């Protein structure tokens, strides 16, 4: 009667493709194709099966809410893995990457990878709900170009601060 989910957040390069670690590397398959094991006691017919469906970590919270019978918020972007197991193509593509690094989109077979910054893709902005970073605040100089931006689907209708990025 226990749902068991085992996953990782990303891989780690140990010299593959000439890269070490993970901070500024392109998001190669070794980093993003990570293990996910799910045992759902409601689905004994799926025990021991392997699925090639395109899923992401955004599907984990909806999976837990679904298992416990809780309602999914209307703005939640992930989908319960119980639905994914029955769908042939639960999603057409997945977007992944990180601010300051490569941004990618995949259909599960091919990946389009784009570097974050060059002279042709300006302007670049940071979006935040509060003007702080992990280790400190934005400087007054960085905040001079701040504007309010339209909300994203995941900000629950709250506008974000749009701050010009300084790569």
Regions found by a protein language model. Give the residues of each.
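C-terminal, low-complexity/hydrophilic appendages and adjacent surface loops
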Residues: 28-29, 99-167
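Histidine-centered active-site microenvironments of extracellular/periplasmic hydrolases
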Residues: 2-47, 56, 91-92
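Active-site phosphate/pyrophosphate-handling residues
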Residues: 32, 59, 111
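Polar, surface-exposed loop/tail segments
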Residues: 2, 48-107
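Activation segment
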Residues: 14-15, 85, 114
């Amino acid at each position: 009667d226990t749902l068991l989910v085992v996953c990782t957040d990303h891989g780690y390069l140990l010299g593959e493709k000439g890269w070490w670690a993970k901070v500024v590397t392109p998001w190669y398959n070794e980093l993003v194709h990570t293990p996910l094991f799910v045992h759902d006691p409601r689905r004994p017919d799926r025990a021991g099966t392997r699925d090639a469906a395109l899923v992401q970590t955004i599907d984990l919270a909806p999976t837990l809410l679904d298992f416990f019978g809780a309602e999914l918020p209307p703005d939640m972007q992930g989908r319960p893995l119980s639905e994914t197991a029955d769908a042939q193509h639960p999603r057409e593509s997945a977007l992944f990457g990180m601010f300051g690094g490569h941004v990618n989109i995949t259909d599960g077979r091919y990946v389009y990878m784009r570097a974050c910054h060059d002279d042709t893709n300006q302007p670049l902005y940071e979006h935040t709900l509060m003007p702080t970073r992990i280790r400190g605040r934005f400087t007054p100089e960085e905040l001079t170009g701040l504007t309010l931006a339209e909300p994203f689907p995941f900000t629950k209708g709250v506008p974000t601060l749009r701050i010009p990025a300084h790569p």
